[in-house]
């Protein structure tokens, strides 16, 4: 497995991976090609992808608010799961964030997603049951 930075040329493969991994996709909002291209231009290192034989089999989007780093959109092709790809992408995310001086790493995980919760616990993350997530959106497309 090779981990390398994704580029906008990988966009179609990213969308296919999200679909195969059953991640929701907002093509008119945050996941549009234009939005992803802008983020990749601003922070190219925030888009690591895992490849097997030049095939995208895993990826993550990293973000930070200068205090905490966020692991977002972690996806692994179901045919390639249980091979350490997700853990490698988490480790790569932490390494990238440490280079920016970030020392707190976070992930938002849907309550029903037991597999992801188990994965992050195995990677040393602590579940905070006393925290409730709020959001406000300008539309359902974003």
State each model region's role:
Residues 63-72, 81, 127-131:
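A conserved beta-turn-beta hairpin within the catalytic core of GNAT-like acetyltransferases
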């Amino acid at each position: 497995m090779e981990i390398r930075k994704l580029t906008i040329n990988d966009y179609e493969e990213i969308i296919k991976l999200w679909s195969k991994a059953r991640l929701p996709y907002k093509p008119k909002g945050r996941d549009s090609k234009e939005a992803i291209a802008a983020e990749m231009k601003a922070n190219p290192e925030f888009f690591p992808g895992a490849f097997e034989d030049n095939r995208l089999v895993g990826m993550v989007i990293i973000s930070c608010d200068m205090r905490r780093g966020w692991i977002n959109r972690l996806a692994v092709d179901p045919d390639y799961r249980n091979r350490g790809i997700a853990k490698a992408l988490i480790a790569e995310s932490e390494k990238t964030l440490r280079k920016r001086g970030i020392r707190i790493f976070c992930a938002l995980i849907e309550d029903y997603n037991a597999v992801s919760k188990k994965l992050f616990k195995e990677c040393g993350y602590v579940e905070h049951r006393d925290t409730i997530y709020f959001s406000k959106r300008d539309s359902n497309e974003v």
